[in-house]
């Protein structure tokens, strides 16, 4: 679920923090910059793991702050393909089932990856697995708050950095940006035995 | 200045701020603020040159962009992340004062949520010795690193879960091997918080210290 990513960055320490230990200031600055943010093609950054190397600090003309090049490792949430994860159902919509891990929310299980046959109950806005046994069909509801085990089948990164002024004409034709895209989404699947609500598979 | 080791310095050296120049920033040692004081007359020129150098061509911005050296340096188990975040929380609690500044809010949120998530998994009760013992015991089963990591993080108790985590388990493992694997996993890894009630039924001697009354 979590990986270690090695990165290099220049950290700026303002002069009023010079009395603090450099390592502490750098830890704080890096966490301030990266924690809880999604890096394009890398994943959701959690927290700093350690600093591997500190290069010399420079002071530039016109700016009293020191700039230090830091080599460090960061803990990033980036599940690998086909990894099994357990999350909570946040809600259902015609697009599929939305699952959340608490710290990461943008997980979608599209309708074709649900246990088949599945149908969307419009009245209750919930997806249902029509489980057939010899006795007849059981309707297994995927209610909000239930824990599900799912497999990660796809991930997509969207670059949400602001566009420059050149695209201002395109943007002004529509009132606002149409919708806020999540920078990092995961697609899940629960179409295998063992996947889906934990309560479906616990032996009683 | 005819020192060949410092290519950035030359007749026009004053216009190129050190560190901004691509090349070896290590050539300059420490802050050279005293040199700027010497070149009084050129002071204003160097400032504007520096700011234009920064705002201009990104190629000239040397070490100023963040760079990812290795996006997959190592896989971390949930237990390791749990340990790291718990230690971080302790440290921040001790140093007290600046936790609530707006800059730290993101770190607070993500550590709280991630800790909350991992605390509900069996990883909470693991320790470095348990993990080491688990990995030694796993050597005989010939599983890939990713499979062992999933077993460590999830602690499966049924054969169907093993089949999910181990690729092509029908071909690679016989039924007895799956049973043996399950037995190794459940005996070495401590049970999670909710699984304690389910453990009562099985005859495994519980590794957990709490007494699930």
Swiss-Prot record, chain A:
Any one GO MF annotation of this record: DNA-directed RNA polymerase activity
TM region(s), chain numbering: none
Superkingdom per UniProt: Eukaryota
InterPro entries (alphabetical): NA-bd_OB-fold, RNA_pol_III_Rbc25, RNA_pol_Rpb7-like_N_sf, RNAP_E/RPC8, Rpb7-like, Rpb7-like_N
Entry keyword Magnesium: no
Region feature (Disordered): 158-178
Gene Ontology BP terms: defense response to virus; innate immune response; transcription initiation at RNA polymerase III promoter
Compartments in which it is found: Nucleus
Any GO CC annotation of this UniProt entry: RNA polymerase III complex
Matching Pfam families: RNA_pol_Rbc25, SHS2_Rpb7-N
Alphabetic keyword roster: Antiviral defense, DNA-directed RNA polymerase, Immunity, Innate immunity, Nucleus, Transcription
Compositional bias ranges of the Low complexity kind: 166-175
Family as reported in the entry's similarity comment: Belongs to the eukaryotic RPB7/RPC8 RNA polymerase subunit family.
Known function: DNA-dependent RNA polymerase catalyzes the transcription of DNA into RNA using the four ribonucleoside triphosphates as substrates. Specific peripheric component of RNA polymerase III (Pol III) which synthesizes small non-coding RNAs including 5S rRNA, snRNAs, tRNAs and miRNAs from at least 500 distinct genomic loci. With CRCP/RPC9 forms a mobile stalk that protrudes from Pol III core and functions primarily in transcription initiation. Pol III plays a key role in sensing and limiting infection by intracellular bacteria and DNA viruses.
Xref: NCBIfam families: rpoE
Assembly mode: Component of the RNA polymerase III complex consisting of 17 subunits: a ten-subunit horseshoe-shaped catalytic core composed of POLR3A/RPC1, POLR3B/RPC2, POLR1C/RPAC1, POLR1D/RPAC2, POLR3K/RPC10, POLR2E/RPABC1, POLR2F/RPABC2, POLR2H/RPABC3, POLR2K/RPABC4 and POLR2L/RPABC5; a mobile stalk composed of two subunits POLR3H/RPC8 and CRCP/RPC9, protruding from the core and functioning primarily in transcription initiation; and additional subunits homologous to general transcription factors of the RNA polymerase II machinery, POLR3C/RPC3-POLR3F/RPC6-POLR3G/RPC7 heterotrimer required for transcription initiation and POLR3D/RPC4-POLR3E/RPC5 heterodimer involved in both transcription initiation and termination.
Name of the protein: DNA-directed RNA polymerase III subunit RPC8
Origin species: Bos taurus
Lineage: Eukaryota, Metazoa, Chordata, Craniata, Vertebrata
Gene name per UniProt: POLR3H
